[in-house]
Amino acid sequence: MSTFALIPAAGSGSRAPGERPKQYAALAGRPMLWHAVRAVCVPPVERAFVVLAPDDAHFAAEDWSAFGERLEPLWCGGQSRRESVYNGLVASRDQWDADDWVLVHDAARPCLPAQDLQALIAECSADAIGGILALPVADTVKKAAKDESGRHRILATEDRAQLWLAQTPQMFRAGLLVQALQRARGAVTDEAAALEQLGLKPRLVAGSRENIKVTWTEDLAMAESILTRRGESIR
């Protein structure tokens, strides 16, 4: 039984404008994707697959030599995260067993702390289903709807005691995840949602606020600050 990582990186990153896809944005001297790969290319993870768009011309222009044979690009990305993860698992099927663990990690999470990754692996390795890194919601959460003029109005206040913010990596048995993604219906924005549709209840492992997802342009400065403080900036 082994552990491998898979990073879906076929998106265009439309909310973080620029000439290059968001995952290749410069961050602490490297592309953001490089930092995401570095975060998961550590023991016990034996290999990392990066799922790219079929027409991706940026990956080959970057230096990935630090990862050696542990990193393998797959040009089989789909139109959605679900398609990209599923396609990546199918394309790499001859390199893993159904009981192996797969860690699916966002290309836009370059600041994953090492202790968060190790906590996830330690707490989920003996779990029958697997689980995800997540944060308990600290802010008050409002449910909203638009009024007749298009302005957002509060409908209700949600019980934040039951709410968590999903992060990555998300860790599941590879065979089970393929089955879940294959059967999933409707909008599936993360792997846990596909498992939920099978009636399963993945575990929640508390992560940290440093594991930010770079979504907006201003998030890049925050990620840069985190990496620089850790001494992971390359100049």
Predicted regions and their residues:
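Acidic helix N-cap motif at the loop->helix transition within catalytic regions
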Residues: 57-63
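Conserved core of the sugar-phosphate nucleotidyltransferase
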Residues: 112-205, 235
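N-terminal glycine-rich phosphate-binding loop and ensuing alpha1 helix
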Residues: 1-57, 71
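Short phosphate-binding loop-to-helix
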Residues: 65-100
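Generic C-terminal helix-cap and adjacent flexible tail
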Residues: 94-98, 146-149, 226-235
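Short aromatic-hydrophobic micro-motifs that form the base-stacking/packing surface
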Residues: 101-105
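Conserved active-site beta-strand element of glycosyltransferases/polysaccharide synthases
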Residues: 202-206, 212-215
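SAM-dependent methyltransferases
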Residues: 1-4, 190-192, 209, 220-235
